[in-house]
Regions:
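Transmembrane helix-bundle signature of multi-pass membrane transporters/permeases
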Residues: 16-27, 151-162
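Juxtamembrane transmembrane-helix boundary motif
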Residues: 2-7, 11-12, 31-125, 141-142, ...
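Transmembrane helix boundary and interhelical junction motifs in multipass membrane proteins
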Residues: 1, 126-138
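Membrane-water interface of transmembrane alpha-helices
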Residues: 163-171
Length: 207
């Protein structure tokens, strides 16, 4: 996203939409390539966790995309800058855990999952990202999921969440940026798929 804004000079909303489109490609590709190291059967067996987070993230993604289309460019840029700072802090401190069990149980866990999903869906939609930066720490810390499995579960949550945000953005006239920059989008998507393939293959070698 910063590259789209600073290096390529896209307006804030256009950059978010472009980033969302390319992230959707990456998530789809990564989900496939990771299946060798994390079987889809294992992902499917944790469907309740995925559903719990989706209950909030779908609403958050749709709502936040609506906000983004109404905000002025400068306002959206300030929101993006603040959220990127928050994500940086989460990335710095959010993965240091060896949790093996859920932090909460029963209705409390469900409520916390919906709330976390709502927040993550909104942030992901506003930044045009998949949300794994926040989903993985949430899955590890809140649900006690293994880090490798958390990566695949985050993709299972991200894909429907991104589709929801993408559908809302498609109603705005800025969505035409995808058609106007088709060659750019395709080249970035191709590179992203290649990177996702390398990452998926390397996952099996990482302890």
């Amino acid at each position: 996203l910063p590259l789209l804004l600073v290096v390529f000079g896209f307006a804030a909303l256009q950059a978010v939409i472009l980033n969302k489109a390319m992230s959707l490609v990456v998530v789809t590709a990564a989900f496939v390539f990771r299946s060798a190291a994390v079987p889809l059967v294992e992902v499917a067996s944790n469907w309740t966790t995925v559903a719990n987070l989706l209950a909030g993230s779908l609403i958050g993604a749709w709502s936040a995309a609506g906000w983004a289309t109404r905000w002025q460019g400068a306002t959206l840029q300030r929101v993006i800058a603040a959220l990127l700072l928050v994500v940086a802090v989460v990335l710095l401190f959010g993965h240091e855990s060896d949790a093996k069990h859920p932090a909460l149980e029963g209705a409390w866990l469900i409520a916390a999952g919906v709330a976390a999903g709502l927040l993550i869906g909104a942030v992901a939609s506003l930044l045009g990202v998949a949300g794994g930066e926040l989903l993985i720490p949430t899955l590890v810390l809140l649900y006690g999921v293994d880090i490798k499995l958390a990566g695949s579960l985050s993709l299972a949550v991200s894909l429907p969440t991104m589709v929801a945000g993408f559908a809302r953005y498609s109603r705005d006239r800025s969505f035409t940026v995808l058609r106007a920059n088709r060659a750019f989008v395709l080249s970035m998507a191709a590179g992203s798929i290649f990177g996702a393939a390398i990452g998926g293959l390397c996952l099996g070698a990482v302890p």
